[in-house]
Amino acid sequence: MLATVQRVSGAQVLIEDKIYSEIGSGLLIFVCIEKEDSIKSITAMVTKIINFRMLDGPKGSTAYSLKDTNEDALVISQFTLAAITGKGNKPSFHKSAKPEEAKLLYDEFMSLFETAYCNVKQGKFGAFM
């Protein structure tokens, strides 16, 4: 499983020019399910993200995690994180899981995340956002 985690002052997901979900200050999290991923790997990623000390603490230090704050999280599925770009001009996505398998694990990832942390929203799996 791959994830890109970014601090944001706010973020929103638009689908067909309508706001689907949005958050205030917190973390924007892009996740990619790969072929070899399992419940074990997604559970580990949820734990890691919730405990990342990326949020502002005293004097601007990054001392706090999501679980230490009341900030928001927005999770977006992004299969292109698995792109292999080493050869040629066309990326290969052979490391990413097939959509049906990825959807099952993504749903489990979201379930685990929502159980561990309540201030989480998400994009729509497979949608053009």
Go through each PLM region and give its residues.
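N-terminal, polar/charged subdomain of small-to-medium soluble alpha/beta proteins
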Residues: M1-S92, L104-F128
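C-terminal helical cap/extension that packs against the catalytic core
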Residues: A97-L105
